[in-house]
UniProtKB/Swiss-Prot annotation:
Belongs to the UPF0235 family. It comes from the Bacteria. HAMAP family: UPF0235 (MF_00634). GO terms for cellular component: cytoplasm. InterPro entries: DUF167, YggU-like_sf. Pfam families: DUF167. It comes from Cronobacter sakazakii (strain ATCC BAA-894) (Enterobacter sakazakii). This is UPF0235 protein ESA_00387.
Length: 96
């Protein structure tokens, strides 16, 4: 499976998360995953909440349309974006 896959109702992203970064950004490919740096620390779900908010902003969707399918407690996550309104250039570059 590639880092970004299209589904009937949106996209599935395989992510590698770097918490406590200096700024939020989609960095690019990291092996077979997309690396995303976020400023939130990995404490009490703060990183997951921040990731959902950041991805919702990047794809111009509601936070409820960003679903963490796998990896709730780890750095490796699978996230589904339902009906994205915009595709960030870093994601479009690796979309299959």
């Amino acid at each position: 499976m590639s880092a970004v896959s299209k589904t009937v109702d949106g996209l599935v992203l395989r992510l590698y998360i770097q918490p406590k970064a200096s700024r939020d950004s989609i960095i690019g490919l990291h092996g077979d995953e997309l690396k995303v740096a976020i400023t939130a620390p990995p404490v009490d779900g703060q990183a997951n909440a921040h990731l959902v908010k950041y991805l919702a902003k990047q794809f111009r969707v509601a936070k409820s349309q960003v679903v963490i399918e796998k990896g709730e407690l780890g750095r490796h996550k699978q996230v589904k974006i339902i009906e994205p309104q915009q595709i960030p250039t870093e994601v479009a570059a690796v979309t299959d």
